[in-house]
Amino acid sequence: MFVKKDDLLSMLISFIYEKKVYVTSVNSITKYKILGFTVVKHIKSDTYVRNVFFKIFRTTRYFTEQEQSLDFSSRHFDVVDLSMDQDKKPLVSVIVPNYNHAPYLKERLDSIYQQTYQNIEVILLDDFSSDNSVEVLKQYARKYPHNTRLIVNEENSGKVFRQWNKGLSLAKGELIWIAESDDYCDVNFLDEVVKAFVHQSVMLSFAHSVFMQDGKKIWTLEQYLHDLPVSFESSFIMPAHTIVNEAFAIKNIVPNVSSAVFRNVGAISDEVTTLWEKMSLCGDWLFYLWLIKGGTISYTNKVNNYYRIHSKSTSLRIQRTLDYSTVSR
């Protein structure tokens, strides 16, 4: 589909001037397959905004030789990462996909509702559980009616990623946290993880994970990622292309989605959802790589996400990875 230059320009100017990711703008951009970058330029002159952004899309035929020069561009743009209001508390949509995790729900939900960061909406999704999960979820929905929605499927969806997509379609927040129903976290988890989004280039921020089994710590994120050249001993913000080359292309450095918060970019690309339908494993890895493209990724070691390993874990590939790594050492 052809997009008029002026229409695209209007979207980009709105995107930048408001200094936030508007779902409507990003949806429009996604539809035209050009969400391959993150805005990190502060406009000094909107007259030549297309000089930078259309060059990114390789449509330099629209510009004169003078307009394409680096000197000309530098006089109209500052290359900086736009920062949001330090006091801003963006709404976080917390999506809790559940299937037969009744024994873990209380600890999970308490760790959400007791967060020190309180600007949240909670979307509880039950995928036709056969245990008493729905009763537990209803108790919390009644206890926190002001910021909770409960959706119970009448039949099982067959794939956890379909539940993710349903939650994303319902989310109103600027940020998304998919908090799996069998995990839990520190009460200041959101406070620390959300801080990174003051930087407009950050597309995903994740926390340190501790792997739990039968109530005991069995591994840490550092142990899981010990064979990568990137250090997870301290917090960082890193360009996506750098961390993909050094780590993300080798191993999924976000082993559990509960440890991550990401920007709400609206509808997920058909390219991703089509692959999701074919995948029983690694769909989260694919999603992260699509999401962070062109931006930066943040990691904090100041708070913990507790990833529970058990027979009904959403993904057992981590358990296989742990077993293999233990044997191979």
PLM regions: where:
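N-proximal low-complexity "stem/linker" segments adjacent to membrane-targeting elements
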Residues: 56-111
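Cell-envelope/extracellular polymer assembly enzymes that use nucleotide-activated donors
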Residues: 90-93, 121, 286
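Glycine-rich, basic loop-to-helix element that forms the pyrophosphate-binding segment
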Residues: 153-171
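The conserved acidic donor/metal-binding loop of glycosyltransferases
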Residues: 180-184, 208
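Conserved nucleotide-sugar donor-binding catalytic segment
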Residues: 226-328
